[in-house]
């Protein structure tokens, strides 16, 4: 007798939510629509998540785990300052491109009208990434004895703004304008400017 693999209902709900965020850009996702997509009642959704905010927190936890774990790998495996910065930005852009619905969460678009703590959590994630970029840039000064003409905090903010802007364009274009489009050429220019400073 063949047994079908047991579906992890929580993961399935989160996958459906991410899919709906991708296929319904600009629209608010209701628990009724999500329940219909998952194929269960709203009551069944609430057996797995006490609120819609907790569902979004589940997506945010996925985002944090995926991005921060890869960020740690970059820090462990790469020592060159400019390559580290490039890889951090590429990580954000590629992650967004591969997860269009989740890009709406990163961008804040999907969180409009939702619980404030969700937006705060995304803000904290971006603050961690910016802090990491600042640390990467400061280490260049320590290792090479030569820094930048601008404060590392200002440069880190600029670099993160580039990635956030590309993600915003991706969401605004309803996922047509890929965040990685022309990034290599743009990075070459940015790197030249950074190394001149």
Curated annotation (Swiss-Prot):
PROSITE patterns: HTH_TETR_2. Its main location: cytoplasm. Residues 30-49 bind DNA. Residues 7-67 form the HTH tetR-type domain. Keywords: Cell cycle, Cell division, Cytoplasm, DNA-binding. Pfam families: SlmA-like_C, TetR_N. The keyword Magnesium does not apply. The keyword Translocase does not apply. Coiled coil: none annotated. GO terms for biological process: cell division; negative regulation of division septum assembly. It is found in: Cytoplasm, Nucleoid. One of its GO terms (cellular component) is cytoplasm. One of its GO terms (molecular function) is sequence-specific DNA binding. Required for nucleoid occlusion (NO) phenomenon, which prevents Z-ring formation and cell division over the nucleoid. Acts as a DNA-associated cell division inhibitor that binds simultaneously chromosomal DNA and FtsZ, and disrupts the assembly of FtsZ polymers. SlmA-DNA-binding sequences (SBS) are dispersed on non-Ter regions of the chromosome, preventing FtsZ polymerization at these regions. Homodimer. Interacts with FtsZ. PANTHER family: ACREF/ENVCD OPERON REPRESSOR-RELATED, ACREF_ENVCD OPERON REPRESSOR-RELATED. Belongs to the nucleoid occlusion factor SlmA family. This is Nucleoid occlusion factor SlmA. It comes from Shewanella denitrificans (strain OS217 / ATCC BAA-1090 / DSM 15013). The lineage of its organism: Bacteria, Pseudomonadati, Pseudomonadota, Gammaproteobacteria, Alteromonadales.
């Amino acid at each position: 007798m063949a047994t079908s693999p047991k579906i992890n209902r929580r993961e399935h709900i989160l996958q459906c939510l991410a899919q709906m965020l991708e296929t319904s850009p600009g629209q608010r996702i209701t628990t009724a629509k999500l329940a219909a997509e998952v194929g269960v009642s709203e009551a069944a959704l609430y057996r797995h998540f006490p609120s819609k905010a907790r569902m979004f927190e589940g997506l945010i936890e996925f985002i944090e785990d995926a991005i921060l774990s890869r960020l740690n790998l970059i820090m462990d495996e790469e020592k060159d300052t400019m390559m580290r910065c490039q890889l951090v930005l590429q990580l954000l852009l590629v992650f967004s491109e591969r997860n269009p619905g989740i890009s709406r969460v990163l961008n804040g678009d999907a969180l409009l009208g939702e619980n404030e703590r969700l937006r705060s959590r995304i803000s904290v994630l971006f603050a961690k990434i910016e802090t990491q970029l600042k640390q990467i840039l400061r280490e260049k000064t320590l290792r090479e004895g030569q820094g930048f003409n601008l404060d590392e905090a200002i440069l880190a903010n600029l670099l993160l703004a580039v990635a956030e802007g590309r993600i915003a364009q991706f969401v605004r274009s309803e996922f047509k304008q890929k965040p990685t489009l022309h990034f290599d050429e743009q990075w070459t220019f940015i790197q030249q400017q950074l190394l001149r400073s």
